[in-house]
Design a protein with these regions (language model features):
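Secretory pathway targeting signatures of secreted, lumenal, and periplasmic proteins
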Residues: 42, 46-88
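C-terminal motif of bacterial Sec signal peptides marking the signal peptidase cleavage site
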Residues: 19-22
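Signature of long, low-cysteine stretches enriched in small and polar/charged residues
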Residues: 46-48, 52-54, 59-65, 96-149
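Surface-exposed amphipathic alpha-helical segments
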Residues: 2, 39, 47-48, 91-107, ...
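Bacterial N-terminal signal peptides that target proteins for export
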Residues: 2-15
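Bacterial signal peptide processing site
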Residues: 24-26
Length: 180
């Protein structure tokens, strides 16, 4: 006859597994600095970081990125440093055009946006896009800029790609963007 300890082992193992799962949330929000210009972003998971050249108009611009994927969506912030407000305006126009071009035939809505401490020129802009293909991932983008002490401008693109499993995750991400 089995001992009472062995009869309860499967139940204890199941309870332990449930307890561990409860300690591992899908959205584990954390503050993450982006670049060296002071932006802090809330990301729902441990970020990966990368650098790459991004063609913006006739220029190839170095872009730093931090982002992660969890709960059915990718959350990312990209950063580029422009030398002047005029260059920042040109780059942001090119960045927006390149993004719209990549989205192809998606239904897009672009509108002015607001972000505390973002500069007015280039102005913050929000883009929401839903590709026409059934099941295709929606895209939410916010572009904004910040003046630097040396006269340059930091440009940012914050993106949520996909449909997060938590309905408030995209709002938490965008509301968690903090400029110094």
């Amino acid at each position: 006859m089995p001992s009472s300890d062995s009869r309860f082992r499967p139940a204890l193992a199941a309870a332990a597994a449930l307890a561990l799962a409860a300690c591992s949330p899908t959205f584990n929000w954390r503050e993450v600095p982006v670049a060296d210009d002071g932006l802090v972003v809330l990301l729902p998971c441990k970020p990966d970081r990368a650098n790459r050249a991004l063609p913006l108009g006739v220029e190839s611009v170095q872009v730093d990125m931090a982002g992660c994927e969890t709960g059915g969506a990718t959350f990312a912030v990209a950063h580029a440093s422009a030398e002047s407000p005029a260059q920042a305006e040109a780059w942001l126009r090119a960045w927006r055009a390149a993004t719209r071009s990549q989205l192809g035939e998606a239904q897009m809505t672009e509108a002015p946006a607001a972000l505390k401490r973002a500069i007015a020129a280039p102005a913050p802009v929000r883009l929401d896009a839903q590709p026409p293909q059934k099941g295709a991932a929606p895209v939410q983008v916010l572009w904004f800029a910040q003046s630097k002490k040396n006269g340059g401008v930091s440009l940012y693109q914050a993106t949520v790609l996909g449909r997060p499993s938590a309905p408030d995750a995209a709002d938490t991400f965008f509301e968690g963007l903090r400029l110094p």
